Design a protein with these regions (language model features):
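Iron-sulfur cluster-binding electron-transfer modules in prokaryotic oxidoreductases
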Residues: 1-174
């Protein structure tokens, strides 16, 4: 998707990846064979949804980039539109407790927070949310590589908050 190159400032590499992706997807979209682009990695989803802005100044790619951005959906957005209550058979006693960690790129980049929680509840889970759920876990693309000491502190804080929530399982939209 070009996100990692974009995060480290490799603008040409990112644009080359974005260009190749848009040209390939554009061909498929023009053929009428694409209803949506569904992404299950929130960092890539955020990047692809931003393609329209990233190449807005490129006359060859701007239109298809806007189309791709508009067609791109996080998996939770797609699942929320399906009649899952007719498909999912929740356990009568529930499935237990799960703490939901909302990745920064999902909750801040794509503004998606409640959908994954609703889906987990629909499946029968007792969803718990950690304290400071809005704070970074320390990864942030390549932040953990470029700023390992700062990232380690953020990670420890996030892990402590996840543990305090008390569920044996952590679910993440990434």
């Amino acid at each position: 998707c070009g996100a990692l190159a974009h995060h480290i400032g490799e603008t040409n590499a990112a644009r080359n990846t974005v260009r190749a992706t848009l040209l390939a997807w554009g061909e498929e979209i023009r053929s009428g064979g694409v209803d949506a682009i569904v992404v299950n990695a929130s960092g890539c989803g955020t990047m692809v949804k931003d393609y329209g802005h990233l190449v807005a100044d490129d006359p060859e790619l701007a239109d298809i980039a806007r189309q791709v951005s508009a067609m791109t959906r996080d998996i939770s957005e797609l699942l929320a539109e399906l009649p899952l209550e007719t498909i999912i058979d929740p356990a009568p006693e529930g499935r237990g407790a799960v703490t939901y960690h909302s990745a920064c790129s999902l909750q801040h980049g794509q503004k998606i927070h409640d959908l994954p929680i609703s889906l987990l509840r629909l499946a029968g889970y007792d969803v718990r949310q950690p304290l400071e759920l809005h704070l970074c876990c320390g990864s942030a693309g390549v932040y953990n590589i470029l700023q390992p000491e700062m990232a380690e502190g953020l990670k420890r804080r996030k892990l402590a908050n996840l543990e305090k929530a008390g569920a044996p399982i952590v679910a993440a939209g990434n």
